[in-house]
Design a protein with these regions (language model features):
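Conserved catalytic core of the tyrosine transesterase superfamily
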Residues: 1-269
Length: 269
């Protein structure tokens, strides 16, 4: 028997985000639709089914959920090994610095101040969009935001001085002294989905490739720019909130466009 309620209580006793909890519960529900109990044989069959039907990253996400469930019910020895994900030799769909600067100038020109600060904060702090919407006026005044990661580790998101001064002026114009700074038209905190959808619309308006305009793209831009100006990957890993420096190493790679430009410049034979 699959103990879904027990698992959900277990998850809610951790520091996992709501999105992660939902994802893990979905995986257990999916397993439960095929099998009515947990055995090593059925776990292996489920893994084979996942591999046949999903991409490696999704397979590993499901396996991570299953392994967490196995911990919950005291069956750690049955944990399933992850499948190997073939890493690409380049970063995909990262907004270029030129497009980022162009995007900022367009938003400023058209008085799209709210969206100007959305992309400014994402690209200048390296915040995830789920972290961005937690920023308050108090954090802007302070110059940083402290958050706790999934493992309970403290992460500080710094707001650079130039951005801080700009944002303080914006808040003063709005006469906002406290509270969340990124609100929707109803005065509620904007959702991550709301940000993603509007960024795509703005990309189309300004003739920027929509494939490179999404919240995490600006976090990638932050990491790329940081490494180009300060080649300290350990420091960047801390700023990004990465558990392992290996995760941060991807930013040492060039984008596909950068690779093409280098090859076109160098290869003349």
């Amino acid at each position: 028997m699959i103990e879904k309620e027990k698992f959900e209580r277990h998850l809610r006793g951790t520091n996992l985000s709501e999105n992660t909890i939902s994802s893990y519960m979905f995986a257990i529900k999916q397993y439960g639709e095929q099998y009515d109990d947990i055995t090593q044989k059925k776990l292996r069959e489920y893994k084979v089914w996942l591999i046949e039907n999903y991409k490696p990253k999704t397979v590993n996400l499901r396996l991570r959920a299953i392994n967490c469930y196995l911990e919950c019910i005291g069956k750690e020895k049955w944990k399933l090994p992850f499948v190997r994900v073939q890493q690409k030799s380049f970063l995909e769909n990262v907004i270029s610095e030129a497009d980022y600067e162009y995007f900022k100038s367009c938003l400023k020109r058209d008085d799209e101040t709210f969206w100007y600060f959305v992309i400014r904060f994402l690209a200048a702090t390296g915040a995830r969009v789920s972290e961005l919407i937690q920023i308050k006026a108090e954090h802007v005044k302070l110059g940083h935001l402290d958050l706790y990661s999934k493992g309970g580790k403290l992460r500080r998101i710094y707001i650079p001085k130039e951005l801080q001064n700009e944002a303080l002026s914006w808040l003063a114009e709005k006469q906002q002294e406290s509270g969340f700074i990124f609100l929707n038209k109803y005065g509620d905190r904007i959702t991550t989905r709301g940000i993603s959808g509007q960024l795509k619309k703005l990309a189309v308006r300004y003739d920027i490739n929509p494939a490179v305009v999404y919240p995490h793209s600006f976090r990638h831009r932050f990491a790329k720019n940081f490494l180009e100006r300060c080649n300290d990957i350990a420091f960047l890993a801390d700023l990004m909130g990465h558990e392992s420096i290996e995760t941060t190493r991807i930013y040492l790679r060039k984008t596909a466009t950068e690779q093409r430009e280098i090859v076109d410049t160098i290869v003349d034979w």
